[in-house]
């Protein structure tokens, strides 16, 4: 998770901020390359073809508004240090769903998001001097990032398979959606959906995989807050 990794590293005054940022965003971009082999290694073709039941329904406007508020409160109780990140994430969600701040919502989604991305890149790039970046430690951080990414993917798939042991036929999960439980949003969700369509061109997993992907993003922010709380 790029923003969380940068926030935690900066708060802890890490000298490896540049390397951590490169590792985080590199592996987020490499989702289509890293995840499929791990998923295929841990699942059978039959499991990858599992179709999940879908119930049509609408979400009330009140629920959409309460969701970011409740998530922020719960995250603040579990890991107070995570509020700075999860609060901004949920604030953007609230801007979009409240229905009365359309101009601010469009600005935040487009102009502001792009501007912050540029400023973030320039800020961190200023710290990536040769004496801090061109070091053996940088390779170790990149390797650690790859290991973490692989284990995250494998852990999600295996946990979904574990849940299937207790679920009745007709309600079993497609284990591939477990791999989307990381913060690489929305790339991981799309990769899982694409893999599902490759196995069965009528098996649409996008709604499930994106939902898991969002959960992974929120959990990642809370995990970063827990790290700061434990190391404070």
Residue ranges and their predicted role:
Residues 15-33, 142-152, 177-180:
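Alpha-helical transmembrane segments
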Residues 20-48, 155-169, 212-232:
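Juxtamembrane and boundary regions of transmembrane helices in multi-pass small-molecule transporters
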Residues 1-16, 55-63, 167-218:
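Alpha-helical membrane segments and immediately flanking helix-loop junctions
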Residues 101-110, 128-143, 160-171, 197-202:
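Interfacial helix-loop-helix linkers and transmembrane-helix boundary segments
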Residues 122, 127, 143-191:
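Transmembrane alpha-helices that form the ion-translocation and gating core
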Residues 92-95, 113-135:
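Hydrophobic transmembrane alpha-helices of secondary-active transporters
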Residues 27, 130-157, 209-213:
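Entry/N-cap segments of selected transmembrane alpha helices
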Residues 23-100:
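Membrane-embedded hairpin module used as a gating/binding unit in multi-pass transport
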């Amino acid at each position: 998770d790029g923003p969380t990794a940068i926030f935690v590293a900066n708060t802890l005054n890490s000298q490896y901020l540049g390397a951590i940022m490169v590792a985080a965003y590199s592996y987020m971009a490499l989702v289509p390359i890293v995840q499929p082999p791990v998923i295929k290694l841990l699942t059978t073709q039959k499991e990858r073809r599992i179709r999940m039941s879908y119930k049509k329904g609408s979400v009330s406007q009140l629920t959409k508004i309460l969701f970011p508020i409740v998530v922020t409160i719960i995250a603040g109780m579990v890991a107070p240090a995570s509020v700075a990140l999860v609060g901004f994430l949920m604030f953007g969600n609230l801007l979009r769903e409240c229905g009365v701040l359309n101009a601010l919502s469009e600005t935040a989604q487009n102009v502001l998001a792009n501007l912050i991305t540029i400023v973030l890149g320039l800020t961190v790039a200023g710290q990536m001097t040769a004496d801090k970046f061109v070091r053996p430690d940088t390779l170790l951080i990149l390797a650690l990032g790859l290991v973490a990414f692989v284990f995250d993917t494998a852990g999600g798939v295996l946990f979904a398979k574990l849940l299937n042991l207790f679920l009745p036929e007709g309600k079993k999960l497609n284990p591939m959606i477990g791999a989307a439980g990381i913060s690489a949003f929305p790339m991981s969700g799309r990769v899982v959906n694409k893999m599902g369509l490759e196995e069965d061109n009528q098996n649409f997993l996008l709604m499930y995989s994106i939902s898991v992907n969002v959960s992974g993003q929120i959990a990642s922010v809370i995990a970063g807050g827990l790290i700061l709380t434990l190391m404070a």
